[in-house]
């Protein structure tokens, strides 16, 4: 491998490349745009485009694309060659400021939730200069926002940038009140931990459910799953290690800060975590990471599964969204310092986040709602569907002392003593970790743990940014009119924390007692996507988005429609796949096995009537019963699907899908899995869980 420092970012048009390629004044103008959010001069765009093209051609690129993130949850791109024809039959290689700054993809073929009709095809992509352009497979990719002809956001990047703008505005107001005149920008930094499964490609291809839906719709429990807890942080297998090495190289070339890799809890499950970066860049990088994971896995004869629950009975995959607030002067506003009880600025931002999560706990749940994630949340492997905040012992004691107006007694930091003289002593952290909390403070950041592994991080961060911005706005309004700043800050912190103590929970989120306690506290428990999504369009939430200029009412309603429709379609596809596998694979296999068992019984009788065939008869009886059960359950599922009212209200259709279709699917699976336990291995038409989870 090349020298890592030389390898890193070689396929990204990053700051060092800009400095090298751009005239000094052009570079300064572009940096002002990136760092201060100023509009870009069209003349500057032309110079940047030309430098970008020359660099891309030297790196072997032949095409360029406006790379964007529509509301499908995956990325989109249309490739155009740099060539322009000349009269003599030759071509000129061109790429100007207009091509860099703006594109015009068809907007009618992407999900719009009613924002665009099929005949209203014009849409625009607009360059996001804060996220570096990069070269992928011979194409110069320019990160862009995507909007309609009328200016409505049709993507995930536009609202994220709007929410960053709102948060920056309100956070700076707070900083100015604390006398900070140096900071020009406040921005969220995020590091998303990405979980995934790896399975052998040939084994995967023999599982039509995995191929079509991303998860197994049938599968009996294997003899060994994750019971021994020996996979987590275990020795990485050579084939997986080779994949990880290749993945790191690909990510580093693009300037993605891949940092940590390890085995996760479930067999064949792993994790990759990057270093923090600005949230819109982190979102772009995470989308790229998921795409590259799949391609690198394919090169290694494997398939990377990003579904939240590919296998029943072992842990699913999530994505921990580590969230902090930083200034352009390098200050982390969520760092409590050595004496958090005396750090008023930290306590203002902390109390703002606590209030935001409490006031908009419904939106926090909406942000992570999907058919796939419903399998994880609250299943003793992921945080519960009830949103709460874990702060740890030290911060909890500080907050209680503020609320109760009592004196906080600071504790001296203990030293870790391991009972072995040769081992070093080191300061013990002020709090333990709580893996059952959906939103946990972990020293100098919050970790939002409810995200599903396949989802874009943009949506959850839009909601976090917007809710925090709104709370900071109210705080700034109150403090700016205060006569005595110190007294006003103390009173504001106490009032805010007192009003939102219910959202703080430091206990076991998996415990059923917490469900009852949360209900007493008035916290929402929204176990499924269908329960959560109506809150997206609640009047208070639409008002929030409009107040912070992140979404219009129409944009919120469109996202509600898209998420609801996606939920219905995903489960319909799973149901149809369940029927197909049952009828064309499992039932024929069970019948063929039953036929051979029956033939064995008859053969015994004909050869030696005195020979007993009790085992065969019992097996045949069980086979027949389970085969009949599967046949009937499959027919019921088909009838349930046909009975669904296509003309019904979207919410009613979603409720029908959740209550009827999923229940009918579960019955088919139960019968199919029972048959897997008794049908001979050589007859079974698909690789088993044991085959899949030990295939790499």
Segments from the language model and where they lie:
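C-terminal amphipathic alpha-helical interaction region
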Residues: 493, 498-696
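Hydrophobic/aromatic-rich, well-ordered segments within soluble, folded domains that form packed cores
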Residues: 57, 61, 65-69, 283-299, ...
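Short linear, low-complexity motifs centered on an aromatic residue
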Residues: 73-88, 108, 207, 214-216, ...
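Active-site proximal loops enriched in glycine and acidic residues that flank catalytic Cys/His/Asp
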Residues: 44, 68, 96-97, 262, ...
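Glycine-rich, acidic/polar active-site loops that bind/position phosphate-bearing ligands
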Residues: 121-306, 315-318, 325-561
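Active-site core of metal-dependent hydrolases
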Residues: 7-120
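Catalytic pocket of metal/acid-base enzymes, prominently hydrolases
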Residues: 1-27, 41, 122-142, 442, ...
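Gly-rich Lys/Arg/Thr-decorated short loops/hinges at beta-loop-alpha junctions or inter-strand turns
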Residues: 1-14, 33-35, 223-232
């Amino acid at each position: 491998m090349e020298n890592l420092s030389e390898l890193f970012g070689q396929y990204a048009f990053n700051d060092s490349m800009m400095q090298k390629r751009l005239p000094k004044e052009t570079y300064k103008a572009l940096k002002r745009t990136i760092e201060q959010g100023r509009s870009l001069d069209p003349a500057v765009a032309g110079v940047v485009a030309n430098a970008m093209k020359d660099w891309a051609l030297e790196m072997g690129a032949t095409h360029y694309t406006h790379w964007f993130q529509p509301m499908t949850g995956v990325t989109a791109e249309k490739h155009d060659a740099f060539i322009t024809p000349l009269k003599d039959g030759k071509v000129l290689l061109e790429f100007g400021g207009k091509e860099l700054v703006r594109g015009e993809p068809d907007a009618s073929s992407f999900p719009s939730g009613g924002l665009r009709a099929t005949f209203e095809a014009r849409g625009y992509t607009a360059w996001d200069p804060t996220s570096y352009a990069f070269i992928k497979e011979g194409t110069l990719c320019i990160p862009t926002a995507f909007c309609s002809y009328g200016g409505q956001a049709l993507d995930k990047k536009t609202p994220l940038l709007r929410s960053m703008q709102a948060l920056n505005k309100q956070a700076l107001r707070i900083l100015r009140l604390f006398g900070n005149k140096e900071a020009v920008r406040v921005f969220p930094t995020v590091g998303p931990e990405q979980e995934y499964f790896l399975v052998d490609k040939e084994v995967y291809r023999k599982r039509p459910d995995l191929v079509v839906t991303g998860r197994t719709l049938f599968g009996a429990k294997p003899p060994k799953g994750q019971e021994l807890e020996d996979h987590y942080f275990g020795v990485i297998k050579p084939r997986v290690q080779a994949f990880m090495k290749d993945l790191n190289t690909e990510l580093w070339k693009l300037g993605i800060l891949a940092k940590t890799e390890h085995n996760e809890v479930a067999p064949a499950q792993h994790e990759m975590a990057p270093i923090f970066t600005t949230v819109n860049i982190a979102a772009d990088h995470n989308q790229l990471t998921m795409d590259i994971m799949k391609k690198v896995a394919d090169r290694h004869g494997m398939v990377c599964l990003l579904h939240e629950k590919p296998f029943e009975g072992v842990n699913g995959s999530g994505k921990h969204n580590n969230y902090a607030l930083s200034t352009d002067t390098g200050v982390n506003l969520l760092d409590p310092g050595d004496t958090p009880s005396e750090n008023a600025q930290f306590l203002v931002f902390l109390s703002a986040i606590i209030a935001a999560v409490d006031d908009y706990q419904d939106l926090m749940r909406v942000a992570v709602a999907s058919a796939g994630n419903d399998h994880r949340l609250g299943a003793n492997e992921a945080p519960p569907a009830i949103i709460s905040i874990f702060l740890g012992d030290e911060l909890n004691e500080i907050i209680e002392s503020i609320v109760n107006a009592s004196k906080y007694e600071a504790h001296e930091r203990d030293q870790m003593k391991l009972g072995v003289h040769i081992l070093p002593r080191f300061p013990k952290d002020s709090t333990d970790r709580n893996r059952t909390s959906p939103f946990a403070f972990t020293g100098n950041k919050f970790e939002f743990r409810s995200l599903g592994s396949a989802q874009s991080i943009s949506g959850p961060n839009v909601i976090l940014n917007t809710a925090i911005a709104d709370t900071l706005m109210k705080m700034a309004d109150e403090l700016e009119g205060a006569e005595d700043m110190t007294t006003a800050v103390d009173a504001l912190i106490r009032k805010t924390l007192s009003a939102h103590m219910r959202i703080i929970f430091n206990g076991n989120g998996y415990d059923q007692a917490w469900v009852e306690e949360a209900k007493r506290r008035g916290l929402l428990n929204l176990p499924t996507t269908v329960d959560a999504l109506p809150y997206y369009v609640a009047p208070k939430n639409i008002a929030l988005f409009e107040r912070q200029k992140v979404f219009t009412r129409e944009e919120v309603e469109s996202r509600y429609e898209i998420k609801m429709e996606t939920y219905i379609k995903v489960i319909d596809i799973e149901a149809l796949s369940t029927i197909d596998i049952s009828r064309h694979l499992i039932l024929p296999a069970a019948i063929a096995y039953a036929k051979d068992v029956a033939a064995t019984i008859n053969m015994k009788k004909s050869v030696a009537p005195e020979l007993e065939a009790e085992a065969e008869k019992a097996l045949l009886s069980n086979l027949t019963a389970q085969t009949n059960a599967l046949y009937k359950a499959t027919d019921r599922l088909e009838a349930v699907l046909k009975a669904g009212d296509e003309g019904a209200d979207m919410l009613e259709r979603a409720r029908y899908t959740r209550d009827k279709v999923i229940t009918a699917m579960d019955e088919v699976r139960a019968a199919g899995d029972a048959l897997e336990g008794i049908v001979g291995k050589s007859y079974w038409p698909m690789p088993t869980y044991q085959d899949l989870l030990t295939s790499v």
